[in-house]
C-alpha cells in the first residue's frame, strides 16, 4: 500500500501501459484541445492528499467544453456556468441537508476536506465525450481503486450511474460503505437520484467511524 499519491504516480509511471497512455494523451494535445490541462489532469490528488481521503465520488468523463474541466469530477471553474448534473446534485443537497445551492460549481472545498472527486477517464478531446476512454485510463483507475480498497480507514464510495458502479466493482473490502445510485444527469435523476440522501448517509457513516463529517456547504461564508 502506498502512503502518498506522489508515490502511487511514481509507481504507475514505470509501467508500460502508463507510458503508452501518457504518450497518447501528449499526441492528442499536439493535435487539438484536450481537457483538463496537463497541470490539472491529476489535481484531485493534489487537493485531496492520500492520507486525508474519506469519500470517493466517481465520475465518468471530464467535461469536454472549453474552460470547464479542471481535474475534479462534476466540478467546474468558478466563473463557468453550472452544468445540469451538478445543478441536480445541488438540488439533492438542498433536499437532503437543507443546504442552499451555491452560485458556482467549484467543488475544491469538498476535495480539501477529503472528498476524492475522480473520473474513470482522466482526459477528453474538446467536444468529443468519451474520446479517451480506450487509451488506458481504465487500468489506471482500477489501480487507484485498488489502493483505496486496501485503505486503512473506512471510506465512503458514492457511485452514481451504471458506469461508476461497474468501474468500482473491485471495491470489496467490507469496512467501506458503498452508496450506489442513479446518475444525476437530467435524463436519469428523476428515476431515483432525487431523494436518495447520499450526503447525510455519508456523514452518518463518517461520524459512526469517528471521522469528521464533510461540510457540504459551498456558499461563501
Swiss-Prot record:
Record's subcellular location: Cytoplasm
Protein name (database record): Uracil-DNA glycosylase 1
Entry-linked InterPro entries: UDG_fam1, Ura-DNA_Glyclase_AS, Uracil-DNA_glycosylase-like, Uracil-DNA_glycosylase-like_sf
Family as reported in the entry's similarity comment: Belongs to the uracil-DNA glycosylase (UDG) superfamily. UNG family.
EC number(s) per entry: 3.2.2.27
Enzyme active site: 61
UniProt source species: Listeria monocytogenes serovar 1/2a (strain ATCC BAA-679 / EGD-e)
Catalytic reaction annotation: Hydrolyzes single-stranded DNA or mismatched double-stranded DNA and polynucleotides, releasing free uracil
A cellular component annotation (GO) from this entry: cytoplasm
Keyword Ligase: no
GO MF assignments: uracil DNA N-glycosylase activity
Top-level EC class as recorded in UniProt: hydrolase
Keywords: Cytoplasm, DNA damage, DNA repair, Hydrolase
Entry-linked SMART domains: UDG (SM00986), UreE_C (SM00987)
One of the GO biological process terms: base-excision repair, AP site formation via deaminated base removal
Any Pfam family hit: UDG
Keyword Disulfide bond: no
